[in-house]
């Protein structure tokens, strides 16, 4: 019950606010799972709801403390919707980001951050203590954007190190890449690749559901100024010996001002 109250409290804070006129719309801070170098503007916040396969749900709240620094928390369950015994993730997870270098015409923006929220089931058996898809952990990300005839085109890359999910014996740093392109003011296409270099030793390969990293794609629809609706196609490089198909998820992002 305490955990359910946490989720309801996050919702009540978020949807009880109003959006001031004349403000610029904050840039997206993530692709599908990959963090970009962008941060929420000061005084803005976002509520994200990720609906996973198996009835799982992750709810996250993030706030722009300054124009460079954002802070957030997330919490959820791998099987919130369904008829089997309800399981919660073991703890709320943190999301911090600070923009080190502003993007310019000739150079990308650079940010450092911490994201401890993984995806899928949380595996506690055999003292693994990790998500199906590990969190990014501590990361350094870079982003560069250009204007095209269709809209914005963004390229993103970064390196990360997960220090909270190492009981499986794989402590390697990781790499990630991504891009987003606007088709019109409402629709965007997102692509990303998580190399999953911290899931490729002999022990973790038996757990990994990907084959050579995670390739994800998504369509994002901004049908009103405050709201993104996203259809995700995750793990397109799935291991056919372990899973039958790639993952389909829905993500809803609501952005507002204090």
Residue spans for each PLM region:
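Transmembrane beta-barrel domains of Gram-negative outer membranes and organellar outer membranes
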Residues: 17-153, 160-164, 180-258
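C-terminal intrinsically disordered extensions
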Residues: 1, 154, 165-167
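Sec-dependent N-terminal signal peptides
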Residues: 3-14
């Amino acid at each position: 019950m305490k955990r359910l109250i946490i989720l309801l409290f996050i919702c009540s804070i978020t949807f009880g606010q109003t959006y001031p006129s004349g403000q610029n719309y904050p840039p997206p801070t993530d692709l599908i799972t990959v963090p970009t170098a962008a941060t929420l503007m000061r005084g803005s916040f976002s509520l994200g709801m990720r609906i996973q396969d198996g009835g799982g749900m992750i709810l996250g709240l993030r706030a722009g403390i300054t124009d460079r620094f954002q802070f957030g928390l997330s919490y959820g369950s791998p099987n919130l919707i369904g008829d089997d015994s309800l399981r919660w993730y073991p703890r709320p997870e943190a999301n911090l980001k600070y923009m080190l270098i502003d993007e310019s015409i000739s150079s990308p923006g650079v940010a450092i951050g911490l994201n401890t929220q993984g995806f899928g089931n949380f595996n506690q058996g055999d003292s693994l203590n990790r998500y199906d898809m590990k969190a990014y952990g501590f990361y350094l990300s870079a982003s560069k954007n250009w204007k095209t005839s269709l809209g914005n085109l963004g390229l993103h890359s970064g390196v990360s190190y997960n220090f909270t999910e190492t009981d499986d014996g794989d402590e390697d740093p990781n790499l990630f890449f991504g891009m987003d392109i606007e088709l019109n003011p409402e629709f965007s296409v997102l692509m990303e690749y998580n190399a999953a270099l911290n899931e490729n030793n002999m022990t973790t390969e038996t757990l990994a559901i990907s084959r050579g990293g995670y390739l994800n794609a998504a369509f994002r629809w901004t049908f009103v100024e405050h709201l993104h609706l996203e259809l995700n196609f995750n793990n397109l490089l799935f291991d056919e010996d372990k899973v039958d198909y790639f993952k389909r998820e829905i993500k809803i992002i609501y952005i507002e001002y204090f």
